[in-house]
Amino acid sequence: SARWMTTGLGVYELYVNGKLIGEEILKPGFTHPYKTKRSFTYEVSNALSKQAGAENVFAVQVTPGWWADKIITYSGQQGMVGTKVAFRGVLELTYADGSKAYLGSNTSDWKAGIAGPVKHAAIFDGEEYDARELPGYDTLDKLSTPEKNTEFEGEILPSNGGEVYFREDLALSPQKAYLWK
């Protein structure tokens, strides 16, 4: 089996072999920026390619969210908590004999990049998405070695059930459109 334990500085989405993992949106949610971050654990065995010699791609898209974007700070001033987004993940593999192996995100085996169709994403300012972006922005030749982020010194705690989910049954449908002059 395979479990992926994750957290981030900023809002993130997870993908395994191109498949979105998890139903929550705005992960890891809003917490005290200096004291706690929430972690999420996913069973990802079904998303893995298990053929001999197969390559599995674990990808994460991280945007500033409440971490590195405009917010109102605890002092009441507009500011940012951190300056750079970050991600931490650990993959736990359990083999047929019960033994386990752990593979963690790091600056030697993982790749990172800032290219892609999402040019800016913020909690209050929305998202800027460039649909003209050509495929291949997430290929290894476009990515580089990630930087280590040491801005957060708080505690990482498991998710406590206060997540946000997209609910299609609550989506609004336009009834009429008009031009306002």
Model feature map: region roles:
Residues 100-181:
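Activation corresponds to long, low-complexity, non-globular regions
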Residues 1-128:
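Accessory beta-strand-rich segments of carbohydrate-active enzymes
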